[in-house]
Regions:
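N-terminal subdomain of lithium-sensitive/metallo-dependent phosphomonoesterases centered on the IMPase/IPPase/PAP
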Residues: 1-97
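Residue-level signal for inorganic ion chemistry
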Residues: 23, 49, 60, 100, ...
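Solvent-exposed alpha-helices and their adjacent loops that cap or buttress functional pockets
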Residues: 37, 83-86, 137, 160-164, ...
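Generic detector of well-ordered alpha-helical packing
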Residues: 50, 73, 96-99, 130, ...
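Short amphipathic alpha-helical face segments that pack within enzyme cores
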Residues: 55, 111, 226-230
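DPxDG-like acidic metal-binding loop motif
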Residues: 82-144
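An extended, acidic
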Residues: 158-276
């Protein structure tokens, strides 16, 4: 199964259509009834998530009838859907509004993530910003590219060491309590640590060379499959903290993505205590 240029154009335009019709009109216009919780008080779902996922699922389901369509909200309603991913020759994985907490609170730091996988291996990844209408995209046989209304250019991460201490994204709130203190102790040797509460924009920042690494927990294919491919095809390194290859089928462990193999090794050594 190979994606043609026409296929990837259709996927992109479907995502842009969902953003125009379902996501942006609701931004900063949600009522309390439009916002609900899922697994925790800060795990939110909005009317925009549901409507955008429904639109993308319907349109791509018609275009790719043999594909498994795996949306975050569909899996929330029926977790067994995720079990089909490993055996799917083609799966389209959708995060309709990544960074829902930001979106629901009126912070313009959210995106749409879409990945296509083959038996769990990412072969296409899209990181789309509905606010600016720009995107970073990659596929298994192409460079990672950034595109907006005026420009399109290939992204290539530098192989040279960072000019300052390596800085990146670590979701402290997702780590077990004892590990948070260990991470805090790393600050003097690593540099700035942040979290955007949005994997889409964290991967975008890494792919453009604006940060040096990102550590991901709570593995979900809609958050990570696209970004892993984007980083790898830009010349970076993205694999599990234990050194094994990433698969969208994985449900546990830590994913470490970095601008280069050397930075990956440096950060992996610093965070190796998470493997104990």
């Amino acid at each position: 199964m190979l994606l043609s240029d026409a296929d990837t154009t259709l996927i992109l335009e479907t995502v842009r259509d969902a953003a125009r019709r379902e996501i942006m009109p609701r931004f900063r216009a949600l009522s309390e009834a439009d916002i609900n919780t899922k697994s925790a008080p800060d795990d939110l779902v909005t009317a925009a998530d549901l409507a955008a996922e429904a639109l993308i699922t319907a349109q791509l389901g018609r275009a790719f009838p043999a594909a498994l369509i795996l949306g975050e909200e569909a899996v929330a309603a029926n977790p067994s859907l995720r079990d089909q991913l490993a055996d799917a020759e083609m799966a389209i994985i959708i995060d309709p509004v990544d960074g829902t907490w930001n979106y629901a609170r009126g912070l313009a730091l959210f995106g749409v993530i879409l990945a296509v996988t083959r038996y769990g291996v990412p072969i296409y990844g899209l990181l789309y910003d509905p606010v600016i209408d720009d995107w970073i995209v990659s596929s298994e046989n192409a460079d990672t590219c950034y595109t907006n209304a005026h420009d399109s250019r290939a992204l290539r991460l530098p192989a040279t060491p960072p000019e300052t201490k390596a800085g990146g994204y670590v979701p402290l709130g997702s780590l077990p309590d004892p590990h948070r203190l260990r991470v805090a102790a790393l600050w003097p040797q690593i540099g700035r640590l942040n979290s955007l509460r949005c994997a889409c924009h964290e991967f975008r920042m890494l792919a453009q060379g604006h940060v040096d690494f990102m550590l991901s927990t709570r593995l979900t294919p809609w958050d990570h499959a696209a970004g892993v491919l984007v980083v790898q095809q830009a010349g970076g390194t993205a694999k599990m903290l234990d050194g094994s290859a990433y698969s969208a089928v994985r449900r546990d462990g830590y994913l470490l993505s970095a601008r280069s193999a050397d930075v990956w090794s440096e950060i992996q050594q610093a965070f190796s205590f998470l493997l104990d």
